[in-house]
Curated annotation (Swiss-Prot):
The keyword Ribosomal protein applies. The keyword RNA-binding applies. InterPro entries: NA-bd_OB-fold (IPR012340), Rib_uL2_dom2 (IPR014722), Ribosomal_uL2 (IPR002171), Ribosomal_uL2_bac/org-type (IPR005880), Ribosomal_uL2_C (IPR022669), Ribosomal_uL2_CS (IPR022671), Ribosomal_uL2_dom3 (IPR014726), Ribosomal_uL2_RNA-bd_dom (IPR022666). One of its GO terms (cellular component) is large ribosomal subunit. Part of the 50S ribosomal subunit. Forms a bridge to the 30S subunit in the 70S ribosome. It comes from Wolinella succinogenes (strain ATCC 29543 / DSM 1740 / CCUG 13145 / JCM 31913 / LMG 7466 / NCTC 11488 / FDC 602W) (Vibrio succinogenes). Residues 220-275 are annotated as: Disordered. Residues 257-275 have a biased composition (Basic residues). One of its GO terms (molecular function) is structural constituent of ribosome. One of the primary rRNA binding proteins. Required for association of the 30S and 50S subunits to form the 70S ribosome, for tRNA binding and peptide bond formation. It has been suggested to have peptidyltransferase activity; this is somewhat controversial. Makes several contacts with the 16S rRNA in the 70S ribosome. This is Large ribosomal subunit protein uL2. Keywords: Ribonucleoprotein, Ribosomal protein, RNA-binding, rRNA-binding. HAMAP family: Ribosomal_uL2_B.
Length: 275
């Protein structure tokens, strides 16, 4: 997918880049697969900020995505490729032979007119086909991977993401995650063949602050620019460096300090992600 540039009508627009929409079909979205999500703007049910630097952003409708791929042994045809405002990859509208329509994440190479199918048994290894991990050959590139059978894909879903099957051991399949982490996942879990499309998303330049505001991202203020009451780095006469190691507003070390809690599933991690 090509990256497009813009004429520098304003200084901020000079360095802004975007993605070409030539792959998107000019069909309206399926209304039955659209829904409105509540805008929390980073607040909890008490109205207090629990996630900083968030706001409402541009109005948008959520597309209901089929992450479970549980419509087994019924062929579907890709009838449209659409933009999804809630994710950085494209989505594909699949029309099945029984008339049902579902959205799936578009893998690289999946185009209008292609066939997709999912099954609990084995299938040909083709982009967009979904099956259980135990039926996928070692070395295959996959995405939209379940962590628990039947729960729906949770891993490798963003633009350009993919994982690889590295081996098998007992009832587990060894997966190399996009981060480089090696992990056991139950062989009964579903996964989809291929790499998530729109990999060029990582190369676009936001270019201007207003574009992030449209995405619902508010500006971040440096701790050193605050008062002492607001941040451990705050205060001082003029520009001053922080004393000691950098910390969060709540005093937690900000660089290199491990905050991950131990949990039962840690035993399924063979090796940690690469730095």
């Amino acid at each position: 997918m090509a990256i497009k540039t813009y004429k520098p009508y304003t200084p901020s627009r000079r360095f802004m880049t975007g993605l070409s929409s030539s792959d998107i079909t000019s069909k309206p979205s399926v209304r039955s697969l659209l829904m409105k999500l509540p805008v929390t703007a980073g607040r909890n049910n008490n109205g207090r900020i629990t996630s900083r630097h968030k706001e409402g952003g541009a109005k948008k409708l959520y597309r209901i995505i089929d992450f479970k791929r549980n419509k087994f042994n019924i062929e579907g045809t890709v009838s449209a490729i659409e933009y999804d405002p809630y994710r950085n990859c494209r989505i594909a509208l699949v029309t099945y032979k029984d008339g049902e329509k579902r959205y799936i994440i578009q893998p690289t190479g999946l185009a209008v007119g292609d066939l997709v199918i999912s099954a609990e048994g084995g299938l040909d290894i083709k982009t967009g086909y979904a099956m259980k991990l135990k039926n996928i050959p070692i070395g295959t590139i996959i995405h939209n991977i379940e962590l628990h059978p039947g729960a729906g894909g949770q891993l490798a879903r963003s633009a350009g993401a993919s994982a690889q099957i590295m081996g098998r051991e007992g009832k587990y399949t060894i997966i190399r995650m996009p981060s480089g982490e090696m992990r056991y996942i139950l062989e009964e879990c579903m996964a989809t063949i291929g790499t998530v499309g729109n990999a060029d998303f990582a190369n676009i330049s936001i270019g201007k602050a207003g574009r992030n505001r449209h995405r619902g991202i508010r500006p971040q203020t440096r701790g050193a620019a605050m008062n002492p009451v607001d941040h451990p780095h705050g205060g001082g006469e003029g520009k001053t460096g922080s004393s000691g190691h950098p910390v969060s507003p709540w005093g937690m070390p900000a660089k290199g300090f491990k905050t991950r809690k131990k949990k039962a599933s840690d035993k399924l991690i063979i090796s940690r992600r690469k730095k």
